[in-house]
Amino acid sequence: MKNITIILNREFASYFTTPVAYVFILVFLVLSSAFTFYLGQFYERGQADLLPFFNFHPWLYLFLVPAVSMRLWSEERASGSIELLLTLPITLWDAILGKFLAAWLFTGLALLGTFPLWLSVNYLGEPDNGAIAASYVGSWFMAGAFLAVGCCLSALTKSQIVAFILTGTVCLLLVLAGFPLVLNFFQDWVPALILDLIAGLSVIAHFMAISKGVLALTDVIYFIAMIGLWLTLTRLALQAKAAD
């Protein structure tokens, strides 16, 4: 646990040694506000809630989360420092969890910056604060799942651009999995069991369920399982690299 904390602190601090972190947070806040108040027609709806705000999160994360995760291991591989890291007296899990948790906390910090929106809707009306709180939790878990995907894919390549594209593509597939258009495409030529599996992989389905204000165990388990699966795949990728 001590090694994880050391790596977490080092990685988290490294985000703020360049302007990139501040640019990321600023872009996230600006786009979140723009999508909420303009594309989401916040005022026209006449309802004191943050539904338009959270509806755009999966699409925002498709671009912003890969921008964070692409450097997690690609940077280490490109600089050659990954060989040094793998020889240190720490376990692979220490390094993986330390890096992942630092990135997850960083995205959580960006999400925390949107809390004034929550205060605004409380000023304008009487929203369902339980549903909003659950939506924040769901959004953070969704970001964590996308980061875990990015963590794995960045371990496969030295190029941050390639890692960005691969992560965005895989996350897009996870978002689209539950869309009726996608399910209708598959329903004529795959068994119902496979169709249910495809629908069950949908990030949006689980996120929207949480956004209704109900933190169902199945939805929480889904995100935890996604994170665990992709971090395990990260470990396998790094083990293969160490064996080269």
Question: Where in this protein do the model-derived segments appear?
Answer:
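Transmembrane helix segments
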Residues: 40, 157-210
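Long, hydrophobic alpha-helical segments
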Residues: 54-75
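Alpha-helical transmembrane segments of multi-pass membrane transporters/translocases
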Residues: 208-244
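Aromatic- and glycine-rich beta-strand/loop motifs that create alpha-glucan
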Residues: 1-22
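Transmembrane helix boundary and interhelical loop/hinge segments in multi-pass membrane proteins
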Residues: 49, 68-86, 100
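Secretory targeting signals
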Residues: 36-37, 44-47, 60, 102-162, ...
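Hydrophobic alpha-helical transmembrane segments of multi-pass membrane transport/permease proteins
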Residues: 19-39, 58-65, 169-175, 229
